[in-house]
UniProtKB/Swiss-Prot annotation:
Pfam families: Abhydrolase_1. Its EC number is 3.1.1.85. NCBIfam families: bioH. Belongs to the AB hydrolase superfamily. Carboxylesterase BioH family. Keywords: Biotin biosynthesis, Cytoplasm, Hydrolase, Serine esterase. The active site is at S82 (nucleophile), D207, H235. This is Pimeloyl-[acyl-carrier protein] methyl ester esterase. The physiological role of BioH is to remove the methyl group introduced by BioC when the pimeloyl moiety is complete. It allows to synthesize pimeloyl-ACP via the fatty acid synthetic pathway through the hydrolysis of the ester bonds of pimeloyl-ACP esters. HAMAP family: Carboxylester. It is found in: Cytoplasm. Substrate binds at W22, S82, L83, F143, L144, A145, L146, Q147, H235. The gene is bioH. It catalyses: 6-carboxyhexanoyl-[ACP] methyl ester + H2O = 6-carboxyhexanoyl-[ACP] + methanol + H(+). Monomer.
């Protein structure tokens, strides 16, 4: 089994592992690397099957997490965006000795809308999966557009995400389909009460995929951490609002209140 693409940079002493979302790759973090490099040693990872960690093998959430753990520092902060947030949360739940702190960005322990739980309708995710077979490229572009919908800088943010996708090899349809299945089927809510490490949860106030209404519900399920809602942001707050995002992240890492 080949190693994942893993790029380490930054002059800081704290290790920070950054995990991207569905359809993308580690290049999505490049715009905030300069703001974080002084405080952190950054580990930019292409998840299995994505970008330069190519391959057609679909992975379960546990398998994907194990692949990242195999190359991760012995102890680090883990930051995951969207699908990457599920991987980071899985690591924190089942390997807490390896995770000094958890940061999730526009992520949810359960992405699918359920009774009294806001999220993405299951039929919408099914629809994207069926579209992957018919129009691979267009389906990815549609999903990227959904991630920025509502933000003041939506058009600019969509262009930025699209450039990230095009900068590296596209994931296979099998890998993308498996990723959508993870978003549709994963439910980590029952395990959240066992988390006993610092946890910062970023949400975009205008996010249509992970609605801000989920924030107090996650707060009620977890004994630790807190939620931070960024006004004017959609599903990619680190792209649309890099300054408040990086400031809050650095304060969290320093152990200060955010």
């Amino acid at each position: 089994m080949s190693a994942l693409f893993w790029h380490t940079c930054g002059a800081g002493k704290r290790d920070l592992v950054l995990l991207h979302g569905w359809g993308l790759n580690a290049e999505v973090w490049r715009s905030i690397v300069p703001q974080l490099s002084a405080q952190f040693r950054l580990h930019l990872v292409d998840l299995p099957g994505y970008g330069r960690s190519g391959g057609d093998t679909p992975y379960s959430l546990a398998e994907m997490t194990q692949r990242v753990l195999a190359q991760a520092p012995e102890r680090a902060l883990w930051l995951g965006w969207s699908l990457g947030g599920l991987v980071a949360t899985q690591a924190a739940l089942y390997h807490p000795q390896r995770v000094s702190g958890l940061i999730t960005v526009a992520s949810s322990p359960c992405f699918t809308a359920q009774m009294a739980w806001p999220g993405i309708r299951s039929d919408v995710l099914y629809h994207f999966q069926s579209q992957l077979r018919d129009d691979f490229q267009r389906t990815v572009e549609r999903f990227l557009a959904l991630q920025t919908l509502g933000a003041d800088s939506a058009r600019q943010d969509t262009r930025a995400l699209k450039s990230v996708v095009l900068a590296q090899p596209m994931p296979s349809a099998a890998v993308l389909n498996a990723g959508l299945s993870l978003l549709r089927e994963t439910d980590l809510r029952p395990q959240l009460a066992t988390l006993a490490l610092p946890w910062l949860r970023f949400y975009g106030a205008l996010d249509g995929l992970v609605p801000r209404r989920v924030a107090p519900l996650v707060d009620a399920l977890s004994p630790c951490g807190r939620s931070l809602i960024i006004p004017g942001a959609a599903h990619a707050p680190f792209i649309s609002h890099p300054e408040p995002f990086c400031a809050a992240l650095c304060e969290f890492a320093d152990g200060r209140s955010v």
